[in-house]
Each structure stands twice: as structure tokens, then as C-alpha cells.
From Swiss-Prot:
It catalyses: 3-methyl-2-oxobutanoate + (6R)-5,10-methylene-5,6,7,8-tetrahydrofolate + H2O = 2-dehydropantoate + (6S)-5,6,7,8-tetrahydrofolate. The lineage of its organism: Bacteria, Pseudomonadati, Rhodothermota, Rhodothermia, Rhodothermales. Its main location: cytoplasm. Its EC number is 2.1.2.11. Keywords: Cytoplasm, Magnesium, Metal-binding, Pantothenate biosynthesis, Transferase. This is 3-methyl-2-oxobutanoate hydroxymethyltransferase. Mg(2+) binds at residues 45, 84, 116. The keyword Transferase applies. Its cofactor is Mg(2+). GO terms for molecular function: 3-methyl-2-oxobutanoate hydroxymethyltransferase activity; magnesium ion binding.
Length: 265
């Protein structure tokens, strides 16, 4: 199948074909997700949570993101690989933000970067786009701002915040973003923003009218069982499968039924 590009996802919006995105953090999972048909693989700073056990995404460093992205890029043949810029890599001087994005593209072989926020990051987005780096925006619940919000509750329920989100979506589009993630906002607002933009929207907890959907792969596969938000659908219970399989292995080792004659030299 042909490789997915930023142009591909734009065409998918125009043709009304929903975009399927998932997070990936390593070679093995990226290879499987790519083969399964995921259009976009997001190397998310959520690796801090599901791979490293942190409570927030803030501890993730740029070097760590580049490492995970390198692993993912080596595992794909088709999917578009988008890499989160972590907290501290773009919030300051726009030149530093551009340098961070350049490192991700050069060292990881990524196809695009993603960053959170609206008006405050527009200049950084413009610098990246001018340099030829595709940028995905992220509005609504932005996990890197959790200590500012104080909660992971739904964002933009009140009209003032909804108006700000509408304006920020337009700002990101005008700055050159090729797509924008809408996280944990009312479905009606997400549908309105999606209709108002010429670029694709990717929803997570934002209803079914966005141009695509993204989930943390560990959540979709039933590996993060201590985190069960309303917007997640479990497509497997791999936690149970893995526990059962390893339990069987341990049992076979204990009773010396593994290895058997066929598994020995």
C-alpha cells in the first residue's frame, strides 16, 4: 500500500474517509500497528505514562522522544509518523522550538511534529512550517498544561473557552498546521470546529464528527487497565492474555515440561 503523507490525510478529509491514528513507542508495536492499517502513528509524550510509569507527560525529554521515534520509524512501511514535542522543547523562544523540531526530523526520521496550544505557539508553528516541517496542532485538553488546569476534565464547556478554542483552531490553520488534535471537548463543538477548518481534525474524546480518531494503543489493547476513561473503547484485553501466557510459562518451567525434546539441541 502507498505510504501515508500529510497530503494523504488532507485528501481523506476531502473525501470523507475517517483517519485512524494510534500511539506507538517502539519498533515491535509500530510494525504491528502499521501492518494493521493505522494511517497515523503518533509517538506521543504519553510514553511518560504508559512506558515509564509517570503520572504526567511532563518528565519526557526531547532525547527520549527522539529515541522512541527512531524505534517507531524503523518499524513502519506505510503509516505517517508524527512525534510530540515534549514539554520544555517549544514553549520558550521560537528559535529553540524550531531547533527541537529540526532535531526530531533529522535524528528520528519523523514525518511531522505535534505541539500543544493555540495563540502562544503560533509563531513557533510558523517558523517550523517555513522551514519545511509539517506540524500537527493540539487543542482542548492539553496534558502538558495539567498543573495549570488542575484536572483532566472536559475542556471548553463554557462559551468563553469554546470561543477561544474556535479562534485558536483558525490560528493554527492559518499558521500552516496540516491537522489538529481535538482532545476531550464537547462533541458538538468538535463537529463545529471540524466543519470550519479546511485541515483535518483528529479527535480523542471529542465525538464522532471529527475527521479522524486517535487512541493510546495501550488503552485500546487493554494494557493500561488502571486507566479507563469514558472515551476509550477496549478492542482487546491483552493484560489478561499476557498474564495467562506468562503464568503458563512459569508453570512449565516449574514442572520442567519446558523445554521438551523438540525444543532442545
Amino acid at each position: 500500500m502507498p505510504r501515508v503523507t500529510t497530503k494523504t490525510v488532507q485528501e481523506m478529509k476531502e473525501e470523507g474517509v475517517p483517519i485512524a491514528a494510534l500511539t506507538a513507542y517502539d519498533y515491535t508495536s509500530a510494525r504491528l500497528l502499521d501492518r494493521a492499517g493505522a494511517d497515523v502513528l503518533l509517538v506521543g509524550d504519553s510514553a511518560a505514562n504508559v512506558m515509564a510509569g509517570h503520572e504526567t507527560t511532563l518528565p519526557m525529554t526531547l532525547d527520549q522522544m527522539i529515541y522512541h521515534a527512531q524505534c517507531v520509524v524503523r518499524g513502519i512501511d506505510r503509516s505517517l509518523v508524527v512525534v510530540d514535542l515534549p514539554f520544555g522543547a517549544y514553549q520558550g523562544d521560537p528559535t529553540e522550538a524550531l531547533d527541537s523540531a529540526i532535531r526530531v526530523m533529522k535524528e528520528a526520521g519523523a514525518h511531522a511534529v505535534k505541539l500543544e496550544g493555540g495563540a502562544p505557539v503560533v509563531e513557533a508553528v510558523e517558523r517550523m512550517v517555513t522551514a519545511g516541517i509539517p506540524v500537527m496542532g493540539h487543542l482542548g485538553l492539553t496534558p502538558q498544561s495539567i498543573y495549570d488546569y488542575g484536572t483532566y476534565q472536559v475542556r471548553a464547556r463554557d462559551e468563553e473557552e469554546a470561543d477561544e478554542l474556535r479562534a485558536d483552531a483558525k490560528r493554527l490553520e492559518e499558521a500552516g498546521c496540516f491537522a489538529v488534535v481535538l482532545e476531550k471537548i464537547p462533541a458538538e463543538l468538535a463537529a463545529e470546529v471540524t466543519a470550519s477548518l479546511s485541515i483535518p481534525t483528529i479527535g480523542i474524546g471529542a465525538g464522532d464528527q471529527t475527521d479522524g480518531q486517535v487512541l493510546v494503543s495501550h488503552d485500546a489493547l487493554g494494557l493500561s487497565t488502571d486507566f479507563e476513561p469514558r472515551f476509550v473503547r477496549r478492542y482487546a484485553r491483552l493484560d489478561e492474555t499476557i498474564i495467562d501466557a506468562i503464568g503458563a510459562y512459569v508453570s512449565d518451567v516449574r514442572d520442567r515440561s519446558f523445554p521438551d525434546e523438540d525444543e532442545s539441541y
